[in-house]
Amino acid sequence: MKRDNDRQTAIILSIVGIVPVIWLALLIAPSISGGLPEIAANLATLFDNPFSIKLCGDSLKTVLILLLCYGMGIGIYFSTRKNYRRREEHGSAKWGNVRAIDKKYRQKPLSENKLMTQNVCIGLNAKKHRRNLNTLVCGGSGAGKTRFYAKPNIMNAARNSYVILDPKGEILRDTGHLLEKKGYEVRVLDLISMEKSHCYNPFVYLQNDNDVQKLVTNLFKSTTPKGSQSNDPFWDTAASMLLLALVFYLHCEAPLEEQNFAMVMEMLRAGAIEDEDDPSPSPLDNLFSDLMIDNPDHIALKYYHSYHSGSSKTLKSIQITLAARLEKFNLESLAALTSADELDLQSLGEKKVALFALIPDNDSSFNFLVSILYTQLFQQLFYAADHIHGGCLPMPVHFMMDEFANVSLPDDFDKILSVMRSRGVSVSIILQNLAQLKALFEKQWESIVGNCDEFLYLGGNEQSTHKYVSELLGKETIDTNTFGKSTGRSGNYSTNYQISGRELLTPDEVRMLDNQYAILFIRGERPIMDFKYDIMKHPNVALTTDGKASPYKHGEVTKDIASIAIWDIDPATLPEKEMEETNWELLSDEEMEALFINNQTN
C-alpha cells in the first residue's frame, strides 16, 4: 500500500511539473535565437519580471523542446527508480505500543471490557472496533490461564451470560458469591458431586428429528475413546440405529416424565434376548408391534426394523454394544441427574445466567455429558437468535472453555466458531499448547485459530507452540557489523556494516518468556508484550475468595424459611372447635406447619 501511494504521488508531481516547464519556456523564448550565451545574459533580467511573458515566433518551438526534455527526464527517472523499503529490507515487525492499542480498544466502564493483560482491554461492543470476541489462550500448567485470564473476566461480571467449563470447581468456588451479588442466576452441572448438581435432561431440547439425530451422533462420538478406531463399524452403526429407534419412540410417544436416558436403559433391558433359540418376542418387540398397528409410518419403526433385520445372535451383540455405550446411565446418580431438566438453556440468551460445568480433572468418564451440553447449547442459542430475537441474542453469551481439550466438541466446531459472532455468542478457548488443538482438530485447527481475533500466550514448554508464536511475531530488520583483523608487518583492521533480519523473538526466546509477562496478538495490530493481569487489583476482588470472601457452596440449603419448635406450643391454645371434632387426626407435614404458624400468629 505504501509503495502504491509513493508511485501515485510521483505521477501527480510529474503532471504538476508541466506548468512550470511551460512557464520557463515562454520566459526564455525571446532569447532562444541567440543561443545559450544570450539566455544566460538575460536570465537575471528575466527573473526580475517573472510574469512579463512576451509571445514570439520561437515560443511554440521553445515550449515543445522543453516539454520533450522534461518528458525524457521523467522517463529516465521512472525507468531507473529503485523500490527501496528502508529499514524494512528483511522484515518490518516491531512491538506494539501498549497504551496506544489499549486506548483504541478500551471502553468505559471497566465492566464493558474483556481483560487481556494488565494494561490492555478490548471492549465488548464489537461493532465499534470491528473485531470478534473469540480468544485463544495458550499457556502451560502453572502459567496462569485460570488466575490471569478466566477469573478476572468472570469477576468483571460483564453484560453477558457465561458458560464456564470448570475443572475441579475452582472458579465456581471463588466467584460464585460475586456473580450472585451482580445479579446472575448461578446454575451448576456438577459431574464431581452429582447429588449437588442441577438436573440436565437432553431430551427436553429435542425439537425435531434432526435434533434426535444430532444427539445420538454426538453421544457415540463423545463416548468413543480418543485415538481408537473400529475395524468393523457395523456394530456401532447398528447400535446407533437401535438407540435412534428408542429415542424417537420416547420423544414422540412417551409422557414427558419418561423421556430420559434412564427410560432408554429400561427399554433396552426390556428387549434383552435371553435365549437365542427362543423365537418369542420380547416386551420391547411387543411395544413396537403395537406402534406398528397405530402408526405404521412412525420414524421409530423405520429404525427399529433396520436394527431388527438380523439374526438373534446379531441382535444380542448389537444390544450389548449399545449397553456398553450407555453403561454410565445405570448409575443411580447419573440417572437421577438426567431424569429432569433445570438448566433452561435458552434463557442464557435472555437474562444474566452463569452456567458452570464442573468436571473432574483426573477422570473423563462423564465428560461426554458436557459434550452433549455444548452441542445443545449452540443449537438452542442459534435457534433463539435466528427465530425469536431477530438474528442476535438480547443477552450475549460467552463460553469460557477452560481445559478445552478435555471435552469432545462437534466436528464442525470451526464452522460454528465462524458464524457465532453475528448471533451474540463468543468463546475463549483455553489450552495448554497448540499440540492439543492439533490433536483434536487435525485438519481444522488453523481455521479455529484464524477465527479468534485475539491470541494470548502466557508461556509454556511445548516446542511447536514456541515456533508458532515466533513465526507469528515476524521478523525485524537490524544493523549488524563484522570485524576483521590481520597481523604482520602490513596488518590492518576493518569493520563492515550491514543490515540483516531476525525474528522479533526466536523460539528459544519465546520459551524463556518471563513468567510475569504475556504476549498478546490482536488482528490487525502489532504484537504486545505486557504484564499478566493482577487479579488482586481488580475492583471486585473483595467479593471473591482471593479477597478473603467466603467460598461459594452449591447444592446446599442456604436459607431457613421458618424454624418451629414443637415444645413452644401450648395445647390449651389450640382452637377448641378442632379439638371437639375428633380426639385425634393424622396431619401431613404441610398441615402441621400451617397449624403451627397459625398458632404463633394468634
Regions found by a protein language model. Name each.
Residues 1-8, 58-112, 281-307, 326-358, ...:
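Short, charged N-terminal helix-start/capping segments
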Residues 39-46, 52, 56, 486-490, ...:
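Extended hydrophobic/Leu-rich segments
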Residues 108-113, 224-234, 256, 479-499:
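Low-complexity, polar-biased intrinsically disordered regions enriched in Pro/Ser/Thr/Gly
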Residues 417-419, 423-519:
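Conserved ATP-driven motor cores of ASCE-family P-loop NTPases powering translocation/secretion/packaging/pilus
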